[in-house]
Amino acid sequence: MQPYQRLLALGFLLLTLPWGQTSEFQDSDLLQFLGLEKAPSPHRFQPVPRVLRKIIRAREAAAASGASQDLCYVKELGVRGNLLQLLPDQGFFLNTQKPFQDGSCLQKVLYFNLSAIKEKAKLTMAQLTLDLGPRSYYNLRPELVVALSVVQDRGVWGRSHPKVGRLLFLRSVPGPQGQLQFNLQGALKDWSSNRLKNLDLHLEILVKEDRYSRVTVQPENPCDRLLRSLHASLLVVTLNPKHCHPSSRKRRAAISVPKGFCRNFCHRHQLFINFQDLGWHKWVIAPKGFMANYCHGECPFSMTTYLNSSNYAFMQALMHMADPKVPKAVCVPTKLSPISMLYQDSDKNVILRHYEDMVVDECGCG
C-alpha cells in the first residue's frame, strides 16, 4: 500500500470513528510509513537545534508555495540526505569530585546509541556539537583546551576509568561558553564497515591558565559552570537512494476544463490529517498536520480529454466501450508531492525525515 493510500484510509477512519477511538490504531500498519514499529512515547521533548527547525520551516514554506525542492539534499548543511537524526549523549562524568587536577577541568565519556541508523543507509554527515553553556556578557576566562579521543575499552559502565585510544581533536577555546562542532564522519568509518551499535568518545576539558585569568574576578568557577551546562549531541545525516527517485511517468497535457464542469467527475478533494486526532502530537514536533487530499469522481469516456488522463486511460475507456467486461478508467493521483516530518522516537532521538508521495496535488483518470 502506497503512503498516500494509507493516509487516505486513515483520514476516512478519523471521519467515521467516534471521537477518542483512534488510539487503538496507533500500533497498526499506519505507522509503518514512518519506519516505526509502534508509536513512540517520550516523556518530554528533547531540545531541537536551530538548524533542524530552520530546515523544517523552509520545507514547509516551499511546499505551501508550490516551489520545487530536492528533499534528498540538505541545503542548510550542504550534504545529500533524506534522514537527519539527532542522537543525545547518554554518557557520564569522570572524577567530578576532584576538578583541576593537572589542569583538568572535567572528563566525560560521551556515549551515542547508533542502533537507530538503518543498515542500508549511506552516511553523508556526522557532526558532534558540544554546548559549553549560554554566552555571557562577561569576558569569561580562562582559556580552555578541549581534547576528544576514541574510547578503546569503556570498562565497567559508569564506575571505572575507560581506556583512552586515538586522539581525534585538540582545540583551544577562548572561554567556557558557546558551541563547538566536530566532524566525526571519519571516526564513524568503523560503523559503516562493521555496523557498530554505539560510539564511545572520551572528552577532557583542561584549563589553560595565564596571568590574566589568575587576577581577573570571575562570576563563577568555570569548571562548575561546565559541569552544570555541558551538553553534547551527534547529528547524523544518511541517504537512502531508493527514496529519491523522481517520477518518470509522463502524462497527456491537461486541457482546460469547460464551464459547467460536473463535480461528480474526477477531481481532487481536500483531506487534512491532524496529528492531534491520532495522538501523534505527543511525539511529532512539526508539522501539526498536513493536507493529504484524495482523488474521487467518475471518468466517463466523453470527458477523458478534460480529466488529466493518461494515454492508457484513454485506451482503456475505448476498450470498455467495446467490451463492458474491461474495467472503466478510475480516478487516481497524477501528481504527488513529499513532506518532511520532525519527531522524537522512544530512544530520545530527534529525527527529521523526508517522505515521498504523501500529498495529492493533482488527479486524473488512469
Swiss-Prot record:
Induction: Markedly increased in an obese-mouse model lacking adipocyte fatty acid-binding protein FABP4.
Entry keyword Disulfide bond: yes
Subcellular location: Secreted; Cytoplasm
SS bond list: C266-C331, C295-C363, C299-C365
UniProt-listed GO biological process terms: endoderm development; eye development; formation of anatomical boundary; in utero embryonic development; mesoderm development; negative regulation of BMP signaling pathway; negative regulation of epidermal cell differentiation; negative regulation of myoblast differentiation
PTM comment: Synthesized as large precursor molecule that undergo proteolytic cleavage, releasing the pro-domain from the active, receptor binding, C-terminal region of the molecule.
PANTHER family reported for this sequence: GROWTH_DIFFERENTIATION FACTOR 3, TGF-BETA FAMILY
Known role: Growth factor involved in early embryonic development and adipose-tissue homeostasis. During embryogenesis controls formation of anterior visceral endoderm and mesoderm and the establishment of anterior-posterior identity through a receptor complex comprising the receptor ACVR1B and the coreceptor CRIPTO. Regulates adipose-tissue homeostasis and energy balance under nutrient overload in part by signaling through the receptor complex based on ACVR1C and CRIPTO.
Protein name, per record: Growth/differentiation factor 3
Gene: Gdf3
